């Protein structure tokens, strides 16, 4: 099994171009699967049948797996068994009749406009790291980028003259996202004045640098955003994805085209973007007051 799993992981990394984070999730799912099979003395892939998989799923449910995690686990092992059958490592695919559980997709908190402004205005612009943080927050809210996308950004991916940023999303898919005047202004000063001071002796092309001149990490960005959220007295769960959700929600609330928002977010399936068509409480109150004859 170990050999087949490694062959499969190599396949999805090379052939499908999946990110390291996605590969890591697949690897963790397959480790759970392999551990369960070994604990139950299943030594060969062709000994696995539908009943064994269902018992494995029952075990994961007993261990407290959420329906979302379970759905991803099933997707992983289904893809794995399809690969094994196609490459003749196995004589059958035992996942054929296994159903994927449905789960409710929940959005994290979305910031109101005044909360976004409070967050953006929190960094100290007199300090290099403060100016960097303001620029990064402006860019996250202006583009709806994922945290993994922003740490992969190089200086050359930002075209200030034409007003766009080139983003490499899931599966290394490239997309172009426009930039507004405000974020262009911050990016210009950051790239020309602040970043060279953060760069020190390093030669990295990464856009956002830590105080040692190296690329900001995923954990570093999460920590920065959480810290400013506390300073701005925002009583909501605040992550880089909160700004992404706020970006999409505010665009759609103000009449943006769903397809255009899908393109900017880098969603392959428009149903994912449609999650943002929920209307905020303040927007509901505004519409009620504006349109109800007895409001």
From Swiss-Prot:
Signal peptide segment: none
Localization per record: Cytoplasm
The Core-binding (CB) domain, residue ranges: 1-85
Entry's Gene Ontology cellular component terms: cytoplasm
UniProt GO MF annotations: DNA binding; tyrosine-based site-specific recombinase activity
A biological process from GO: chromosome segregation
Superkingdom of this protein's organism: Bacteria
The Tyr recombinase domain, residue ranges: 106-289
Statement: the UniProt record of this protein carries the keyword tRNA processing: no
InterPro entries per the UniProt record, alphabetical: CB, DNA_brk_join_enz, Integrase-like_cat_sf, Integrase_catalytic, Integrase_recombinase_N, Integrase_SAM-like_N, Recomb_XerD, Tyrosine_recombinase_XerC/XerD
Gene3D superfamilies: 1.10.150.130, Intergrase catalytic core (1.10.443.10)
Assembly, per entry: Forms a cyclic heterotetrameric complex composed of two molecules of XerC and two molecules of XerD.
Protein purpose: Site-specific tyrosine recombinase, which acts by catalyzing the cutting and rejoining of the recombining DNA molecules. The XerC-XerD complex is essential to convert dimers of the bacterial chromosome into monomers to permit their segregation at cell division. It also contributes to the segregational stability of plasmids.
Protein name, UniProt field: Tyrosine recombinase XerD
Record organism: Staphylococcus epidermidis (strain ATCC 35984 / DSM 28319 / BCRC 17069 / CCUG 31568 / BM 3577 / RP62A)
């Amino acid at each position: 099994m170990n050999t087949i799993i490694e062959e499969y992981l190599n396949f999805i990394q090379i052939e499908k171009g999946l990110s390291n984070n996605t590969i890591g999730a697949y690897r963790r799912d397959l480790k759970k699967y392999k551990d369960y099979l070994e604990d139950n003395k299943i030594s060969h892939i062709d000994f696995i049948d539908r009943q064994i998989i269902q018992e494995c799923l029952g075990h994961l449910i007993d261990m407290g797996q959420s329906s979302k995690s379970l759905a991803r686990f099933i997707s992983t092992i289904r893809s794995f068994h399809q690969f094994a059958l196609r490459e003749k490592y196995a004589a059958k695919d035992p996942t054929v009749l296994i159903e994927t559980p449905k789960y409710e997709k929940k959005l994290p908190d979305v910031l109101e406009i005044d909360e976004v402004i409070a967050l953006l205005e929190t960094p100290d612009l007199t300090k290099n790291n403060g100016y960097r943080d303001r620029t990064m927050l402006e860019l996250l809210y202006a583009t709806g980028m994922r945290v993994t996308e922003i740490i992969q950004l190089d200086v050359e991916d930002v075209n200030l003259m034409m007003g766009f940023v080139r983003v490499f999303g899931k599966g290394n898919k490239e997309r172009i996202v426009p930039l507004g005047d405000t974020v262009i202004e911050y990016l210009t000063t950051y790239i020309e004045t602040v970043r060279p001071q953060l760069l020190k002796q390093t030669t990295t092309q990464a856009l956002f640098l830590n105080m040692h001149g190296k690329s900001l990490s995923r954990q570093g960005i999460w920590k920065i955003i959480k810290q400013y959220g506390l300073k701005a007295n925002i009583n909501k769960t605040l992550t880089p994805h909160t700004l992404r959700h706020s970006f999409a929600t505010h665009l759609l609330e103000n009449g943006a085209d769903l397809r255009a928002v899908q393109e900017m977010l880098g969603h392959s399936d428009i149903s994912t973007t449609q999650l943002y068509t929920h209307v905020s409480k303040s927007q509901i109150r505004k519409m009620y007051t504006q349109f109800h004859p007895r409001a």
